[in-house]
Swiss-Prot record:
GO molecular function: ATP binding; glutaminase activity; NAD+ synthase (glutamine-hydrolyzing) activity
Catalytic activity line of the entry: deamido-NAD(+) + L-glutamine + ATP + H2O = L-glutamate + AMP + diphosphate + NAD(+) + H(+)
GO biological process, one term: NAD biosynthetic process
Organism: Schizosaccharomyces pombe (strain 972 / ATCC 24843) (Fission yeast)
Ranges for domain CN hydrolase: 5-275
Protein name listed in UniProt: Putative glutamine-dependent NAD(+) synthetase
Active site: residue positions: E45, K114, C175, S359
Spans traversing the lipid bilayer: none
Enzymatic class: ligase
Length: 700
């Protein structure tokens, strides 16, 4: 006997606190799921509110408006005759829960609270929600009065239960629960659950998709079953980009996969599966023996068939064939992820475009290429008749008839660049900036900042009677650093002025978002001036290492047809803030006292491996001991932590950056540390003592 069910998983570009917009996107996804003949629709985690509401989850208004939206959704005529799984926060016994609402034909069947909350990395769910730490316990939830009147329903079961439909059993697993060692799907599978639904609010990190795919594949390969994974997509108001990639697996095989990076506000994937194949897959006696020894879940009986055809054989349905999993290269992830994040931020901020100080170096070049990538993605969406994208483009450029799908033409409307040179700038950097801007089509300005910086120096001399000098002219380190910082900070001031007025110069309305271009390695080392060009509105590369940026530009050179990028890759990274002499040319790595490759290693050990100075030294002795002496390794570690400690305060004012990597330094909520450090005296003594032992052993 065959029992074909068609099931749908959604990825929605929700916006935190945009209740009306979120409701419309949810309804659109339900309509699309029905158009694909699905009888079950699963949406992202907390889709009614948007996942990123943060402390708004502590406000009673958030719960009130969520119920209003839910009533509107499940009463909608287009949302009937399909089993709905909708995510929203619910308050039960004065406790806030992250919940799934399972509803059918205007009635709520079950409220399933999240059992295991996510509290690592960027996640702080226990700050807002209480976990349902009572396996298989179900209580009665009394609906708010206005909801009870609207639905003609006073109570609903709340807790860890499963749905018994006419021909199959449905169980719920929410995001983090999949990642835990003892995931709920294990016990649910042993109790006969055949369809698992997982709503997620999982953000993008380079190479993270592989982890999700492996977990779902392994779960269904081991336990058998049909697994629907739904994820939010887009920038919902913060540093994170939720990268979709909704999936449907059956017995270890992928049947459908949503796009990871896309501008579509609503995307629905579906698959048709024979439930009997799950039962056949679970033939092992050990599966049954383990099942009968486990306590049972409470079953909520639902008189609804997920399979529309009730005879033994359905000649009108064909099961979905397995497909290959799509995993992008890290370079592709950098090309598309930050670009889509930039577009969401731009259209939702109602700005007129972006302004970027284009220095002619690799970092600002990377940011410019990401904006160009964004315009290519936008124009492709317009070619595919995406009405929402077209509407947003016309509003941003201020032309209700705009229809061009030329990325360079669009970029010229909304992207402004400026080379802010000084007497220390080289012809090469100025030329590279101009050529890149010409190649991608930005509105480019070339300005000299010497007038501004000399005015500040003259004012200081007038007040103090002393004129600071560069080190090459006999000045002290303090003078040398101050003169560099004046140049850097004047660029920030000038950048915001240009962002405010350049659209006016061209006869356009609105102002621009200022883009920053400091990479994660420089932020970690503190190799940036506080309140210079690193201070901006947003930074698309602030979570990406120099090493990954170089790989990205090598990829973009071919993929985006930008041969000029090779010149940026070949150039020596330099701030160009000091005079160049016959014996001295400023270099970033020389200034820092460490290479970008070394910084990347330090960053991974510090954050991912959770190493302090001493354990980092012991780790690096294994990695670098064959080419460096113990004292050299010790010196590098001590130097890194010295500069990390004295510059940590800069992270507290860091421009909001696209979160891209697990070694990020975002002080907002990802990398929480003090910003006033001691001198690591005890740690340094321990490192020196161990280095001495290593060297004594080597001399024997």
């Amino acid at each position: 006997m065959e029992r074909y069910v068609t099931i749908a998983s959604c990825q929605l570009n929700q916006w935190a606190m945009d209740f009306e917009g979120n409701r419309l996107r949810i309804i659109d996804s339900i309509k699309e799921a029905k158009r694909q003949n699905a009888s079950l629709r699963v949406g992202p985690e907390l889709e009614v509110t948007g996942y990123g509401c943060e402390d708004h989850f502590l406000e009673s208004d958030t719960y009130y408006h969520s119920w209003e939206m839910l009533c509107s959704i499940i009463h909608d005529p287009d949302c009937q005759d399909i089993l709905l799984d909708i995510g929203m926060p619910v308050m039960h016994k004065a406790m806030r829960h992250n919940c799934r609402i399972l509803a059918l034909n205007g009635k709520i069947l079950l409220i399933r609270p999240k059992i295991w909350l996510c509290d690592d990395g960027n996640f702080r769910e226990s700050r807002w929600f209480t976990p349902w730490l009572r396996p298989r316990v179900v209580e009665t939830h009394y609906l708010p009065t206005f909801v009870a009147k609207s639905l003609n329903q006073t109570t609903v079961p709340i807790g860890d239960a499963i749905l018994q439909c006419n021909e199959t059993v449905v169980g719920v697993e929410t995001c983090e629960e999949l990642f835990t060692p003892n995931s709920p799907h294990i016990d649910m599978a042993l109790d006969g659950v055949e369809i698992f639904i997982n709503a997620s609010g999982s953000h993008h990190e380079l190479r993270k998709l592989t982890t999700r795919v492996n977990l779902i594949q392994n779960a269904t390969e081991k336990c058998g079953g049909i697994y629907l994974y739904s994820n939010q997509r887009g920038c919902d108001g913060g540093r994170l980009y939720y990268d979709g990639s909704s999936m449907i697996f059956a017995n270890g095989k992928m049947l459908a996969q949503g796009h990871q990076f896309s501008l579509k506000d609503v995307e629905v994937i579906s698959a048709t599966v024979d439930v009997d194949t799950v039962r056949s897959y679970r033939f092992q006696p050990s599966h049954g023996i383990q099942g009968v020894t486990r306590p049972s879940y409470e079953r909520i009986h639902v008189n609804f068939s997920l399979s529309s055809y009730q005879q033994d054989y359905d000649i009108y349905r064909k099961p979905t064939d397995p497909i290959e999993v799509t995993i992008p290269l890290p370079e592709e992830e950098i090309t598309f992820g930050p670009a889509c994040w930039l577009w969401d931020y731009l259209r939702r901020s109602h700005a007129a475009g972006f302004f970027l100080p284009l220095s002619g170096g690799l970092d600002s070049c990377s940011t410019a290429v990401l904006v160009y990538s964004m315009c290519r993605i936008v124009c492709k969406a317009m070619e595919e008749d995406d009405a929402q994208v077209l509407s947003d483009v016309r509003r941003i450029v201020g032309d209700p008839s705009y229809s061009s799908t030329d990325p360079k033409k669009l970029l010229n409307h909304l992207f402004y660049t400026a080379f802010m040179g000084s007497e220390h700038s080289s012809k090469e950097t100025r030329s590279r900036a101009k050529e890149l801007s010409s190649l991608i089509g930005s509105y480019h300005t070339d300005v000299n900042i010497d007038t501004m910086t000399s005015a500040v120096v003259k004012l200081f001399a007038l007040v103090t009677g002393k004129t600071p000098q560069f080190r090459s002219n006999g000045g002290t380190n303090a003078e040398n650093l101050a003169l560099q910082n004046i140049q850097a900070r004047s660029r920030m001031l000038l950048g915001y002025l240009f962002a405010q007025l350049l659209p006016w110069v061209r006869g356009y309305s609105g102002s621009l978002l200022v883009l920053g271009s400091s990479n994660v390695d420089e932020c970690l080392r503190g190799y940036l001036t506080k309140y210079d060009c690193s201070s901006a509105d947003i930074n698309p590369i602030g979570g990406i290492s120099k090493t990954d940026l170089k790989s990205f530009l090598r990829y973009a050179k071919e993929a985006l047809d930008l041969p000029i990028l090779q010149e940026f890759l070949d150039a020596t990274p330099t701030a160009e803030l000091e005079p160049t002499t016959e014996s001295y040319v400023q270099s970033d790595e020389a200034d820092m006292g460490m290479t970008y490759a070394e910084l990347s290693v330090f960053g991974r050990l510090r954050k991912i491996s959770k190493c302090g100075p001493y354990s980092m030294f012991t780790q690096l002795m294994h990695q670098w001991g064959d080419r460096l002496s113990p004292s050299q390794v010790a010196e590098k570690v001590k130097r890194f932590f010295h500069y990390y400690g004295i510059n940590r305060h800069k992270m507290t004012t860091l421009t909001p950056s696209y979160h891209a990597e697990t070694y990020g330094v975002d002080d907002n909520r990802y990398d929480l540390r003090q910003f006033l450090y001691p001198s690591w005296t005890w740690q340094n003594k321990k490192i020196d003592a161990l280095a001495s032992k290593f060297e004594q052993h080597q001399r024997k």
